[in-house]
């Protein structure tokens, strides 16, 4: 049935598409045309690491998924009893009209939206790297398009540094007739934009917000390709309590949504494992004097400190903690992979343990080929933001190839995805549309990031599910 539907959709798309000789306009972050290092990949051969069809595995309507991010049962709410009803084990269906709507007669490109971060704060630099991954994916897709297929066009808007601004941008993208969009990094912006997405019915692929409550809204126009807080904080809680034997855990965090949601999730996990957090303190981003926090944490005598905040701040604080004689182990999330932490922490980084998504030095062909193409295009190595943005764009581009210029059918292709093999590895989507692939444990040793040995995640070999082809 799935393959029959694909053939009908592909035939409909081919009949409605017209060849457009004009190159798509791709704007830089901030809306200005951009000259960047390297050349667009016009002469590069497409990746040959794996056939595209084998990288997409789809589910079936009404299918049940393991609850709560596929975490160990001891971390579930109501783990010791069977509740009357468990939410988030099936995907919310879309029962509205639209799948049979005809495309516009004057369609000259397939538009993809992107909501950047505002040009303030550290998220701007992450947004630039996100954009680089998306632009590369679109450039490659335009090179590989077949005769009669429309080009892809990136419609981009800089974020607004005001609460609620993302709603206006999501509405603007709808007015500009995008078929799907990517973004945003900030969790508050993502939540606000998603509410508009429910009304405009344009699928959103989030590539960088780990807030687990984003997909728990059960709005069936969203998937997230980045593993969420449950994967990171759940893994860290198990590591601290079960493997390291920590019984007195303190938390030092910022007051933003990223840290607030992450700390709440971690505290829940630690409590369920029998080691409630003994202290939770806040700091202001950019602060240099945290003498109050140091004194309070020192008095609580923790054997572990979990940091949530910007890596430059955490690096500076780690150094101050060691100078104050605090010997507790340091733990953190993926942000500690950034160079700012090691630069500010110096020797105090030794032994700091954190979670990350995959080893950048692994030899997976999809990753190594992407890494080379990205460096050739942009002049530097890709980070996690660029890689997940590339994967998110690839999922959306694939759906648009299959479904054609119909955003309701594009939604079906995106939202029904169970497994996807991207440059970041295999993804596994749960009943809310969130990637639940396991994360890695990393430790700083002698100034180097050392990844704990762990097998690469892959889907079961006999899923019995269908794949589609581009």
Question: Positions of the model-derived regions?
Answer:
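Extracytosolic ligand-binding ectodomains
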Residues: 6-10, 17-470
